[in-house]
Amino acid sequence: MTTAGYYAAVDWGTSSFRLWIIGEDGAVLAERRSAEGMTTAAKTGFHTILDGHLAAVSAPAHLPIIICGMAGARQGWKEAGYIETPAALAEIAGRATAIPDVDRDIRILPGLAQRDRRHPDVMRGEETQLLGAAAHLGAGSHLVCMPGTHSKWVRLADDRVEGFSTFMTGELFDTIARHTILSHAVAEADTFAAGSAAFTDAVSRTRENPALATNLLFSVRAGQLLHGTAAADARAQLSGTLIGLEIAGALAGSGSVDGVCLVGSGGLGTLYRTALESQGLNVRAVDADEAVRAGLSAAARAIWPL
């Protein structure tokens, strides 16, 4: 049976692929998910993977496709470039890159670049989440936290990105937990409770004394050796130390901040919400999956109006 639709929306990450068929009323008519991210697609072919998923939901041949994420990277399907900040979110759709020599209309959204020589930064994929999340925020200035392998903190003013900072918190956690002496402290625990005192105490201690971060990291191992800290608590301390360091850096120079928009989902979203609220910050949560779909929808409707 053919799945009718207005367009297909794709979030193509480094190691993940998500596709939604969207109807004219904005409803999700079909969905596909896989681990065929940019790394896989660069070997097997972006067009081949996309066509396979479209065929699996019997998408019509004329259906246009809007894509965000790593498919637009230099190593991706076709480089979509960057929009330089400060930039209005409304510019994103107008700067989409078309894929040539294909039998349907396929566009890839650009990323954002901050070319400040002292604070260079880039994002690709998160700008689409921002576009979707902005509808929930309204006018005024907002600080947006987008947790992930490389977390983004974005300064928004009236739907305009004034600047942003990336923190390698997720990647550092994985590296430290797997490949340093702290691996011995956390190896016996895969998870921990987000609301545990070990986690929130580590967030607070590191935010208060960010210059001591590496000392606090070593104390995770020392605490286990000297006081028998449980592996789950050690893992919570490691995570809390790194997230506390991130929060300290993100809020430095931001002036008085009493609230943060958190664009996240799942366990990671819960973890960051707990961390932020433990620091007395008001959190306005936006689901990350809903935000990326809303951003892709806004771009698609700007490019292909009904």
From Swiss-Prot:
ATP-binding keyword on record: yes
Annotated metabolic or biological route of this protein: Carbohydrate acid metabolism; D-galactonate degradation; D-glyceraldehyde 3-phosphate and pyruvate from D-galactonate: step 2/3
Catalytic reactions of this protein: 2-dehydro-3-deoxy-D-galactonate + ATP = 2-dehydro-3-deoxy-6-phospho-D-galactonate + ADP + H(+)
One Pfam family it belongs to: DGOK
Phenotypic effect of disruption: Cells lacking this gene fail to grow on galactose as sole carbon source.
Molecular function terms, GO-annotated: 2-dehydro-3-deoxygalactonokinase activity; ATP binding
Gene Ontology BP terms: D-galactonate catabolic process
E.C. numbers: 2.7.1.58
Domain of life: Bacteria
InterPro entries: ATPase_NBD, DGOK, DGOK_C, DGOK_N
Enzyme class: transferase
Keywords for this protein: ATP-binding, Kinase, Nucleotide-binding, Transferase
UniProt key word Plastid: no
Function text: Involved in the degradation of galactose via the DeLey-Doudoroff pathway.
UniProt record similarity statement: Belongs to the DgoK family.
Record protein name field: Probable 2-dehydro-3-deoxygalactonokinase DgoK1
Gene name tied to this protein: dgoK1
